[in-house]
Amino acid sequence: MLPFKTLALFLLTAVAEIVGCYLPWLWLRQGRSAWLLVPAAASLALFAWLLTLHPAATGRVYAAYGGVYVAVALVWLWTVDGVRPGPWDWLGVSVTLCGMAIIAFAPRGG
């Protein structure tokens, strides 16, 4: 799979997972409507389906996806929660994304 397509799929997958977890959090912690569980379930189903679109071995996909998830969660923290990440947050996500790139795009023998 091409690197751009892989990254786009990882980004979409991360957003689906975060939305699927954030909506129940709103219901449980902020007293929002239980109807939020309906789009949350749909979002988590989309998340699971998106994971199946990656051609690599499942464990490798999960490991590489985890790096993108960390980056998207940090952006979510900033844009949705209104908490600006600090320099250590950005350094941590940079290291994580380097690891993701190695796992996802390193040449594989055989």
Curated annotation (Swiss-Prot):
Subcellular location(s) of the protein = Cell inner membrane
Q: Does the keyword Membrane apply?
A: yes
Bilayer disposition of the protein = Multi-pass membrane protein
Q: Which domain of life is it from?
A: Bacteria
Which keywords label this protein?
Cell inner membrane, Cell membrane, Membrane, Transmembrane, Transmembrane helix
Q: Which residues cross the membrane?
A: 7-27, 33-53, 63-83, 86-106
Q: What is its main location?
A: membrane
* One GO CC term on file: plasma membrane
Pfam families from the UniProt entry: UPF0060
The family assignment reads: Belongs to the UPF0060 family.
Its protein name is UPF0060 membrane protein Dtpsy_1668
Species the sequence originates in: Acidovorax ebreus (strain TPSY) (Diaphorobacter sp. (strain TPSY))
